[in-house]
Structure formats: structure tokens, C-alpha cells
């Protein structure tokens, strides 16, 4: 087995995104092309490549390639606890994900480099009449590297179809904090409130540099076929948060000791932390009735992970985020 590698060029990355949903059983009903513009056409085949590297006492955004609708401006150093870490906002010039969109994101973290990647706002997946949207993400973190991938929530609108595949290759001395938040549509908009999307399909796979699979998490959500509000799925909750922490084993027990499981039906919050296979890391899941509850749960796990792994805490959040 060979290790997951970064695509060599924009064309290869975009082709991976174009191929992603073609043979997916959950998308078999949605292979029709949009009449306005073909899937993956100009403006609908986004690409972003970010490369973080160490330069002296700090890290920099050493490489950036892009194709619309993706956009990144200069890296900022806003984290006072980690002033050596470049922080990058991913921006979409389209403002949302539309039917027929094919998106590819590649991130490379060089040895001993740091990086933080987030989005400028929530990612909205608009309603669709034809086809679907697909996203491929490839993340590679070399020896001693550290990456925080902390995007804002995803909001799948009524009738949307989305498939995403994330391939992670990580050195055993490196650390990745990978977060995702999925909301139940536009909660306070009558036409879109609740789980009314058609398909949300996700796969995340991590391997080492020898190609050994560390773990795979796969889920296909089809609320029109099976209610997500049933017991054992979302129950009474409306927002789902998921954080994957890949880090050396010596940190695991200390983090687990500080992350007590929680369930409070009155306030509407539930969370817990588990070990991933092959001693590669931990996974934290949190359910809430409101987005701020899930964000607070993720922020707690993020802060504890930082303190135990790096010996630094998390600064107070910006008042505008």
C-alpha cells in the first residue's frame, strides 16, 4: 500500500473532485447535469493549495495556489499564545456551495512547521435541483508539524446533496486538530429548518507515511430515508460537532482525564471523548441544540489539547466570531 500523496497539479486535484461522487451509491439518483452550467465547469472547479514551512523561529505560509471560487489573503499572526503560527482564512468568492461545484483543498505542513486554517464564515450548501456538490481534501503533516483545521459550521440547506472525502497523511510525531460542525439547515428559517437535505456523505481517512491506515470514519446522512432525530443518531439535538485529534500517544491519557463525558437534557448538550485505533489519537463528539453550545464544547477540547500537547492555552475568542 502506498501513502496518500498530495496531487501534483491543479488538474489532478480537480479530477479527483470530479470523480468523487460518480460511483457513490448514495448519489446515484443525482447524476443529472445542471442545465445552467456543467458540473466542474469554469468557476465551479475550485482549488486551493496551502504550504506551511518553518523559517527561523516562526512558521510562514510558504506556498499558495488557488482557483476560483477559493481565495486566501496573507497569513496573519493573531494568536498571542502561539505568535509563531500563521493563521489563514479560507474565503469563497461565491459565498456558498452550489449544485455542480467540485472543490479540492490540499494542505502541506513541512517538518516542525505550524499552521492554523479556518473559514471567514459558515459554509452554506444551497438547495439543488440537479446533480450534487463534491469536495476532496488532502492533508499532509510531516515530522513535528502542527496543524489546526478549525472551519466554521456547515449549513446544508433543504434539498442539498454533498459528498466530501478527506485524506490525511501524518507523521507519528506530528499533531492535527481537525474540527467540523454540521447544523440542521437554517434553524430559524421555516422553509429550511430541520434536517431536510437529501444527502450529506463524509469519509475521513488517516494513514502514516508508510501507507498504514490509522483509522477511517464514514457516515452517510439521508434524513428523508431515515430520520436523524431518532434515538442513537441526533435525538433531540440540532447541531453536531466532531473533532479528530491525531497526536503522539503520550498525550492521550492526560487529555482524556480532563474531558469528562457530559449529558444535560435541560440545557441541551451532550459530549464525549474516545480513543482512535492504533493509538493514533482521540475523537471528540458533541451534540447541542444551539451552535454556541457546540462551539463551546469544541473550544474546551481544543484548549485542553493545546495545553497538554504544547504547554500553551487558547486565547479568548474574538468577539465577532
Curated annotation (Swiss-Prot):
GO MF term (any one): nickel cation binding
Subunit structure: UreD, UreF and UreG form a complex that acts as a GTP-hydrolysis-dependent molecular chaperone, activating the urease apoprotein by helping to assemble the nickel containing metallocenter of UreC. The UreE protein probably delivers the nickel.
Function of the molecule: Required for maturation of urease via the functional incorporation of the urease nickel metallocenter.
Source taxon at top rank: Bacteria
GO-annotated cellular components: cytoplasm
InterPro entries attached to this UniProt entry: UreD
The organism's taxonomic lineage, starting at the top: Bacteria, Pseudomonadati, Pseudomonadota, Gammaproteobacteria, Enterobacterales
Keywords attached to this entry: Chaperone, Cytoplasm, Nickel insertion
Protein name: Urease accessory protein UreD
Family: Belongs to the UreD family.
Subcellular location: Cytoplasm
Signal peptide: none
Amino acid at each position: 500500500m502506498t501513502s496518500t500523496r498530495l496531487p501534483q497539479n491543479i488538474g489532478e486535484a480537480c479530477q479527483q473532485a470530479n470523480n468523487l461522487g460518480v460511483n457513490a451509491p448514495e448519489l446515484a439518483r443525482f447524476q443529472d447535469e445542471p442545465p445552467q452550467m456543467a458540473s466542474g465547469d469554469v468557476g465551479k472547479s475550485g482549488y486551493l493549495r496551502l504550504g506551511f514551512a518553518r523559517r527561523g523561529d516562526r512558521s510562514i505560509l510558504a506556498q499558495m495556489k488557488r482557483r476560483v471560487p477559493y481565495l486566501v489573503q496573507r497569513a496573519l499572526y493573531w494568536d498571542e499564545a502561539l505568535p509563531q503560527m500563521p493563521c489563514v482564512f479560507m474565503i469563497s468568492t461565491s459565498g456558498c456551495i452550489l449544485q455542480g461545484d467540485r472543490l479540492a483543498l490540499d494542505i502541506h505542513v513541512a517538518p516542525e512547521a505550524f499552521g492554523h486554517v479556518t473559514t471567514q464564515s459558515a459554509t452554506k450548501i444551497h438547495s439543488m435541483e440537479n446533480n450534487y456538490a463534491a469536495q476532496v481534501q488532502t492533508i499532509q503533516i510531516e515530522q513535528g508539524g502542527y496543524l489546526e483545521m478549525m472551519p466554521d459550521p456547515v449549513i446544508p440547506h433543504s434539498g442539498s446533496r454533498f459528498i466530501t472525502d478527506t485524506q490525511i497523511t501524518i507523521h507519528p510525531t506530528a499533531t492535527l486538530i481537525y474540527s467540523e460542525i454540521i447544523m440542521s439547515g437554517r434553524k430559524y428559517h421555516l422553509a429550511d429548518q430541520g434536517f431536510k437535505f437529501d444527502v450529506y456523505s463524509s469519509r475521513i481517512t488517516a494513514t502514516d507515511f508508510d501507507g498504514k491506515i490509522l483509522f477511517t470514519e464514514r457516515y452517510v446522512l439521508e434524513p428523508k430515508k431515515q430520520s436523524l432525530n431518532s434515538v442513537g443518531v441526533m435525538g433531540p439535538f440540532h447541531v453536531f460537532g466532531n473533532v479528530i485529534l491525531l497526536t503522539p500517544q503520550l498525550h492521550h491519557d492526560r487529555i482524556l482525564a480532563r474531558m469528562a463525558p457530559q449529558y444535560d437534557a435541560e440545557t441541551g448538550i451532550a459530549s464525549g471523548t474516545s480513543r482512535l485505533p492504533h493509538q493514533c489519537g482521540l475523537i471528540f463528539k458533541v451534540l447541542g441544540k444551539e451552535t454556541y453550545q457546540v462551539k463551546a464544547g469544541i473550544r474546551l477540547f481544543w484548549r485542553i489539547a493545546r495545553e497538554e500537547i504544547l504547554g500553551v492555552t487558547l486565547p479568548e475568542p474574538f468577539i465577532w466570531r
